A protein has these predicted regions:
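Membrane helical hairpin/interfacial module
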Residues: 23-118
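Membrane-interface loop-to-helix entry segments
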Residues: 104, 132-162, 344-351
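Extracellular loop-to-transmembrane helix junctions
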Residues: 29-58, 337-354, 363, 367-373
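Selective recognition of specific alpha-helical transmembrane segments in multi-pass small-molecule
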Residues: 44-56, 89-100, 129, 150-165, ...
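Hydrophobic, membrane-embedded alpha-helices of multi-pass small-molecule transporters
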Residues: 7-26, 41, 45, 89-93, ...
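Membrane-interface "cap" regions at the ends of multi-pass membrane proteins
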Residues: 1-37, 209, 358-374
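Hydrophobic alpha-helical segments and their helix-loop junctions in multi-pass secondary transporters
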Residues: 94-97, 133, 152-177, 193, ...
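Membrane-interface interhelical connector segments
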Residues: 241-271
Length: 374
């Protein structure tokens, strides 16, 4: 594999991962089957996700620090099977980019653009994503840092507003574990585990570009922890403003919550703040999966310049997002009830674990042969 020229700084990767983890999870309810304990689902999923990433994808990264996921897959299991597995991940990354694009379009239509064709919204988003990707991974990561700072300011503003508003009641978050751990585990597996923390497997395509490789695992763990805290804050806001019953039934609870908040009849109708947050985080969620699919195709098909793949893969993502489901209800049902079992669990956990074990075995055999020959 050729030495990578473009590099990512640690702070830029941290910002990128945080925005990626927030993605559509910041507005789509996560773990609400556990009702008041949804925040425990988020924290538990984050803890498991950090441990898993440190052991399995992190272990693979330590074995092959200069190779992307699709590249070292061929090194581990051979060129033929490795290529097939890599191609499966290429399709997976494109599919999840399409799902997130559909999430983005559905929310914008439900919130403010009901008269705008879905196709137009998708084109605007994917053209913007494709343009930043075409500028290179370094520009993409630096752009993430700029918008990360803006999103931090938005979150601080939202928190202050909730604390000062008379519509929020944090007693609604109680009781903690009122029904025990069973609802938490039920909500955690598999949806709370695979979304969003299991999706970190996609970052295995980008870690080789980090210019301080020894910081990779600390950066990913810190970014995952911060995103979990922000998602917990969003859950607290939803439950304290709407109550647990409405928050658990709402399709986009954060949007509903902030549309109700007001401060002294001066600051009100803050649903536009949620739209801004959604556009930014969705941009980097869609862009990350699309970028990963482009790098995977670049590696598998030996394309000289990956930037030539931006348009064709962008068109595939757009068309798939438009045809993926008949309506938003069907789309959410598939994303929460079907995709986690049949796609996320095998591709986020099962296959990486197998690759890691085979990689360790191959290294042990190689070390034993080297010791025997010396």
């Amino acid at each position: 594999m050729k030495k990578t020229i473009e590099t990512i700084g640690p702070i830029h990767l941290f910002a990128w991962i945080t925005l990626f983890q927030l993605g559509t999870a910041v507005v789509v309810p996560v773990g609400m089957d556990a009702k008041q304990d949804a925040w425990i689902v988020t924290l538990t999923g984050c803890l498991i996700g950090i441990l898993f990433f440190a052991i399995v994808p992190g272990g693979l990264y330590r074995l092959y620090p200069s190779m992307t996921f699709t590249a070292y897959t061929r090194r581990i299991v051979g060129p033929f099977l490795g290529w097939l597995i890599g191609f499966g991940y290429l399709l997976y990354f494109m599919y999840i980019a399409s799902r997130n694009t559909r999430d983005f379009m559905d929310l914008l239509i439900a919130a403010a653009y009901d008269a705008t064709p879905m196709f137009v919204l998708g084109v605007f988003m994917l053209v913007a994503v494709g343009y930043i990707i075409s500028l290179g991974i370094e520009v993409y990561a630096r752009t993430a840092f700029i918008f990360f700072l803006m999103c931090c300011g938005v979150f601080i503003f939202i928190i202050l507003l909730v604390l000062l508003s008379d519509l929020s009641d944090f007693r609604r978050i109680q009781p903690v574990l009122g029904e025990g751990w069973h609802p938490v585990w039920k909500a955690l597996f598999p949806t709370g585990l695979t979304f969003p923390f299991g999706e970190m497997i996609v970052m295995a395509m980008f870690l080789p570009y980090l210019n301080q490789k020894y910081k990779a695992l600390r950066i990913t763990a810190g970014a995952m922890a911060l995103s979990a805290i922000l998602l917990c804050i969003a859950t607290f806001i939803n439950i304290s403003v709407l109550g647990v019953e409405i928050a658990s039934r709402a399709t986009f609870p954060l949007f509903t919550s902030l549309s109700r908040l007001r401060l002294a009849e001066i600051v009100q109708r803050l649903d536009s703040v949620v739209l801004f947050l959604l556009i930014i985080t969705s941009f980097f969620k869609i862009g990350t999966f699309m970028f990963a699919s482009i790098l995977a195709a670049h590696d598998l098909f030996k394309v000289r310049n990956y930037k030539t793949l931006v348009m064709p893969i962008g068109v595939i993502v757009l068309l798939t997002s438009l045809t993926i489901a008949g309506n938003s209800t069907e789309h959410l049902r598939e994303g929460l009830k079907i995709v986690p079992y049949y796609m996320h669990l095998p591709l986020q956990f099962a296959i990486p674990i197998c690759l890691w074990l085979v990689g360790l075995l191959r290294r042990a055999i190689r070390n034993r042969r080297a010791a025997a020959s010396s």
